[in-house]
Amino acid sequence: MNLLVSKKSWMLAPAIAVASLATLAFVWAVMEPEALRAAFDEHGASFVEVLTIPFYALIVPLVWLCCPFGGSTKRKALLCLGVSCVAAMAVVKEMDLHLAAMTAMYPEIVAKFSGTPFKMRFLTSGSVPLGAKAVVVLYFALFFGVFAAMLLYYAKTLLKAFFRLHPVAWSVACMGGSGIMVQLMDRLPAWWRHSQGLAKDQVPAAFSSFCTAFEEGGEMMLAAFALLAILQAHAIYAPDRPAEGLDV
């Protein structure tokens, strides 16, 4: 049985998701908070972050060599270019290159600003120069903007395919779920800290390490599901597949 194209292939992504979440929970339970943070989050240099980068980097050649899209050559090239752009920006984010570039260009602004400059409050601050804001806007446009545009383009097709148990749609759904988990775990410590009126160093170490494990682990899961969706789509469709790329 080919796991990519069988009638039960839609179950592959959820099974991987459950196994991944269970593994992350186990790792969090057995590791000390400080050791876990060192292994998962060291500004792009930790073991897990370094291991995640090839997953995102592999998306770029894979989407061109195993094109999952149908239609004209121009359409396929534009969609592959969009996927490549998002994957490249994901590598930039994982390695914290965007923060390094901002720090190099505007060191005084970054030093005075509490937290990362890649936040909405950075854009709304009156003390931040227009050039620095433009860099942040460009980052958001290339990463989240292109991703959102592609998601909206395929939203109706993916929704129909999801309820028809299409493997690609379920892999994309798990990818989206991983992305939501990453954002939630990134914000959760700050939300909880503000709600309790605590200082940053008063957040319980176990809670902080839990969020770190699922945030960084979720980024690897996201990349893995993207690779799986590309492989499934390429395996399922013939060279003359329909223009929408999903036969639903």
Language-model segment annotations:
Residues 2-91, 99-102, 106-247:
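Polytopic alpha-helical membrane-helix bundles and their juxtamembrane interface segments
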Residues 94:
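An anion-binding catalytic pocket shared by soluble metabolic enzymes
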